[in-house]
Amino acid sequence: MGDPASTQLLPGLDWLVKFGFGLIVAAAGLLLIRPTRRGGLRFALGVFTIEAGTLVAIRGIVAAGSSHWWQYLMPFALVLVPALFIAAVLTRLHWWRRVGFTPLREWRAPHLVVPLLLILVLPIVGLSARGVLQTTVLVLGLQIGFLLIDIFMEEVTYRGVVLEALRAFSIGSRVMISATLFGLSHLDNLFLPGADPVGVAYQVFEAVLVGVLFGAVRLRMNTIGLVMAVHAAYDLMLVLAFGHALPVAPTLPGFILATVVNLALAMLGLLMLRRPPGTAVGLQKVA
């Protein structure tokens, strides 16, 4: 077993160090996305890097706060800033419809709602076993507000902008790259006070698997709204059961069960993409 102090290296960094590191990473991302017309992968990596750096920088700002009342509002900045950034990107590129904000008449493959809803089985079981954690209306309201902004930011970034930026790649590659970046985006949780590296690694791994299913459904159904709704329901059940959706180290049985279920759903997602040319994705004609 390693030295406990070593596992707290990143969470224990001074807030200025976290803030500075985050700004440097975000600045590197800006350099990557400058030539927006050259290389979709570079643009996607740039968006990912900007988001990751911004989250780390804001974690530094939050860590610097004291016990003033406004400190409890600071976590909203953690997701509001990258959410506003990604909304600005969509507006600048006129991509809102292309990334899945489509009218109901353009939705496809409604039967894929079934595998999408299967992702909720584990959190439903967990919530049923633990029950709803007692809390106040104010705290729950703040948690739900944070959650909704966070879901918008994550889904629009990884099932929206990143997938669209990678259109030059095969559909399978687009989904896998997007899912991998989605998983890696959770590494900023290493900077949380008391962060468990094993829990963060587990969250990254499972997020990649979930991201495959979400990406496949997003492209096949030609809508991002349903994916956002299911993602929000997933995280809300974690909040109701545990009081938060932060990464924790799983038990071995829990890890095996979650991995088997999510791996099966990820494989199902990849099977969804094995369609004849012209029927896999409805984005091409929207360009």
Positions of PLM-derived features:
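C-terminal membrane module of polytopic membrane proteins
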Residues: I24-G29, V230-A287
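Juxtamembrane helix-entry segments on the extracytoplasmic side of multipass membrane proteins
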Residues: Q8, V132-I144, F191-E206, L252
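Short, strongly hydrophobic alpha-helical membrane anchors
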Residues: M1-G12
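Functionally important transmembrane alpha-helices
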Residues: M176, G199-T259
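Alpha-helical transmembrane segments in multi-pass membrane proteins
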Residues: L10-F21, R37-L90, L112, L140-L142, ...
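Juxtamembrane "helix-exit" motif on the non-cytosolic side of transmembrane helices
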Residues: G2-D3, A57-S66, I124-L133, L187-L192, ...
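Small-polar-interrupted transmembrane alpha-helices in polytopic inner-membrane proteins
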Residues: L147, G172-L187
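Membrane-interface helix/loop boundary segments of multi-pass membrane proteins
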Residues: M153-A179, L219-T223
